[in-house]
């Protein structure tokens, strides 16, 4: 289907738009009644590996909310299966790695990712969506550090002690792990763009655990290589992290056309720091649990803080939480659409 709404593509290029485009991280998920009904029939991996069902889930928020972009429904760990990682997605916990990568043997056991063989269902989902979507489709992948944190820790972590111990104690091995993950995610993202994704987002959800000095030494060179490898595909790339206020300058230098801001980052400060670089964000997801008067106030605050500057994509500072009322998400879209009314 031809796009009837390219607002997000224009905003990602820093071009003027009549209003900010709006979409939400985790806009397809457990807060939706229709999604919960599907989950009664399918597990998360079953949805992701069934292109027709996965496309249906991806389309849910486009139809129900009127957002300006769809994001492919998947998990950031999805491509790791194709690298030989034994993992399970545990409800209310997240990915659990049954063969953690903590030594040279574990790193060398990671297979090169061949997307067409390892995740053909992801690429077929994209092709289905491109026939049906009136808005741009965002493909995505986890950033190397965030994926490494899962692989080394064995699952979600609060303190990242194992991953930091490897990083500090075995630097050469750390860089070998990051090189493998960087190459794999570059292939995965390029394959998504070639299948039809209009934009890409790189999620570095846990990189805020690092200091700026550690980011520059242990992560930034790999992110630079990742973004350089994506330039030939010619689609805008969003670079997002959580807790990254102290890393924004380095993240900008590492690459990406748009920088995603979490809700702890003051928007006026970030726009001054980043200059002409487009930004995405940054409503606190918890605001969506509040009364509509509070939601309106906070949405208007963010719009005012942006000051009408080009290159702003309205989003949350992290993903929608499952407890969120659907009508509150729809209300945010209506508030943004009022800007152009």
UniProtKB/Swiss-Prot annotation:
This is Uroporphyrinogen decarboxylase. Pfam families: URO-D. The record marks 75 as: Transition state stabilizer. Its main location: cytoplasm. Pathway: Porphyrin-containing compound metabolism; protoporphyrin-IX biosynthesis; coproporphyrinogen-III from 5-aminolevulinate: step 4/4. GO terms for molecular function: uroporphyrinogen decarboxylase activity. The gene is hemE. It is an enzyme of class 4 (lyase). NCBIfam families: hemE. Signal peptide: none annotated. Substrate binds at residues 26-30, 75, 150, 205, 318. It comes from Thermus thermophilus (strain ATCC 27634 / DSM 579 / HB8). Homodimer. Keywords: Cytoplasm, Decarboxylase, Lyase, Porphyrin biosynthesis. Its EC number is 4.1.1.37.
